[in-house]
Amino acid sequence: MLYPSIDLLMQKVDSKYKLVTVVAKRARELQDGAELMVKKPVSKKFVGQALEEIAGDKVELVEEEK
């Protein structure tokens, strides 16, 4: 079973496409040296850690105005 589950993540974000974009951006930030916002991540990979941050409400999603 995957952690965090897609069902949990979809409660935080209204679109799978937006979720992928946000996770990719946050994973890139982590790779570039940003501070991890979860204390003991389950995943050792940046994408997994980004997913855990979103599931734990550690990352605020902000809509850009067009």
From Swiss-Prot:
Keywords: DNA-directed RNA polymerase, Nucleotidyltransferase, Transcription, Transferase
E.C. no: 2.7.7.6
Spans through the membrane: none
Top-rank EC class of the record's enzyme: transferase
Pfam families linked to this entry: RNA_pol_Rpb6 (PF01192)
Classification via Gene3D superfamilies: 3.90.940.10
Assigned GO CC terms: DNA-directed RNA polymerase complex
One BP term from GO: DNA-templated transcription
SUPFAM superfamilies: RPB6/omega subunit-like (SSF63562)
One MF term in the entry's GO annotations: DNA-directed RNA polymerase activity
Parts forming coiled coils: none
InterPro entries listed in its UniProt record: DNA-dir_RNA_pol_omega, Pol_omega/Rpo6/RPB6, RPB6/omega-like_sf
Role this protein plays: Promotes RNA polymerase assembly. Latches the N- and C-terminal regions of the beta' subunit thereby facilitating its interaction with the beta and alpha subunits.
Family designation: Belongs to the RNA polymerase subunit omega family.
Family matches, as NCBIfam families: rpoZ
Quaternary state and interactors: The RNAP catalytic core consists of 2 alpha, 1 beta, 1 beta' and 1 omega subunit. When a sigma factor is associated with the core the holoenzyme is formed, which can initiate transcription.
Protein name: DNA-directed RNA polymerase subunit omega
Organism name: Geobacillus kaustophilus (strain HTA426)
Species lineage: Bacteria, Bacillati, Bacillota, Bacilli, Bacillales
